[in-house]
Amino acid sequence: MEKQNLKNTEVNLIYGVDDDLDLPKKVLFGLQHIFAAFGGIIVVPLVIATSLGFDSKVTTALISASILGSGLATIIQAKGVGKVGARVACIMGTDFTFVSPAISVGSVLGLPGIIGATILGSLFEVILSFFIKPLMKFFPPLVTGTVVALIGLTLLPVSIDWAAGGAGSANYASLENLAVAMFVLVITLLLNNYGKGMISSASILIGIVVGYIVCIPLGLVDFTPVKEASWLSFPKILEFGVTFDAKAVMAFIPAYFVATIGTVGCLKAIGETSNIDIGDKRVAAGVLSDGVGSALGGLVGSCPNTSFSQNIGIISLTKVASRHVAVMAGILLVILGFLPKVAAIITGIPNPVLGGVGIMMFGTVAAAGIRTLSNIKLTERNLLIIAISMGLGLGVTFRPDVIHNLPEAIRMIFSSGISTGTIAALILNAVLKESPTSMEFENMYDEEKKAS
């Protein structure tokens, strides 16, 4: 059993990590996770397919395969198979970290090259998982709290873009979009705070459904993709072939390294919101699951899979940390991988609706990190580590062009604000030592606390 966190950091959960629920509740809570993650699951293959000029048949197959691969990887991560899987409520999908290398490889070797690099590159993450234990000593609460806060803060701009209608949309920041987003935010907030039982726990799902319905008469829902989508689709193993190339694999290695760092941070964050201490064995099992899930994803024709940070906030808001809910979400994703028409309905959720719930979800993740940091002694050294790590992580997030002139391999590693902030926190925590003045202040603080 994993030991529980300190009481002052605990979340008042309705269902713990290993608590099972009846089927209707698992489906209901599982759908909430799917709605939060679905946009991220399909947008990466869509961006890759569009950038490489794939035809509609290949694009549709790639998206269906990504949904199926995400479901399989989620089931393995949440349920666990032997030593594989962290066995927590973790949703899996393809991260934007893999977009650049996939386009680079695909422009030369096509989709078979991407699939080959995905499968062989996953072995790097599998190997890396066996070295997690000695690395975990570099992740004290100071580092994990900073990383968790960064996960939420770096995702908030995404939710704001959603609320405005989506980055690059013709009606960006229109009053209609903002009104819908604020309406959904208020509905979700009221249900979560004042609702009882299932109403409170299902507040995100209810908010999305209500927002979706409101958007239909406003003309914000396009049902064309639903009409055009087929009812059934059966992704095939290596349907478009596979090409193994050493250079292609090397292009994916930095992205897999960044994904590993992100997974460690996500699992730690899930631990914080689930009232468990995610130990090194569980983290190693989670990273191993990333590698296995990516290999499976490649086999069914999708890109690598890694943990999705946007689902962490759902645990805090719904007070449901059950991994069985995540398993159900994985099962539903697998089913959706075979039902393009149903998947298209979910894909059609308007951006302002996602923005309304996203602001609440991602803000909750940031607050969880701040709560962790509030339980450590904020000495001058610790404040410096938090400040610089946050500054660099948010700086890269808000001004991504600042690393434009770096070599491609280095640029890939620091392209994510989460990875940049995490690396900074790890290095600073290892290098910076407490000054004599800070240590003296800390001793005085301890004595005063004991005296009181």
Curated annotation (Swiss-Prot):
Pfam family, one: Xan_ur_permease
Record's keyword annotation contains Transport: yes
Residues spanning the membrane: 34-54, 58-78, 83-103, 108-128, 138-158, 172-192, 201-221, 250-270, 326-346, 348-368, 383-403, 412-432
GO molecular function, one term: xanthine transmembrane transporter activity
Bilayer disposition of the protein: Multi-pass membrane protein
Location of this chain's protein in the cell: Cell membrane
Keywords: Cell membrane, Membrane, Transmembrane, Transmembrane helix, Transport
InterPro entries reported in the protein's UniProt record: NCS2, UacT-like, Xan_ur_permease
Major site of localization recorded for this protein: membrane
Annotated PANTHER family: PURINE PERMEASE C1399.01C-RELATED
Protein's name according to its UniProt entry: Putative purine permease CPE0397
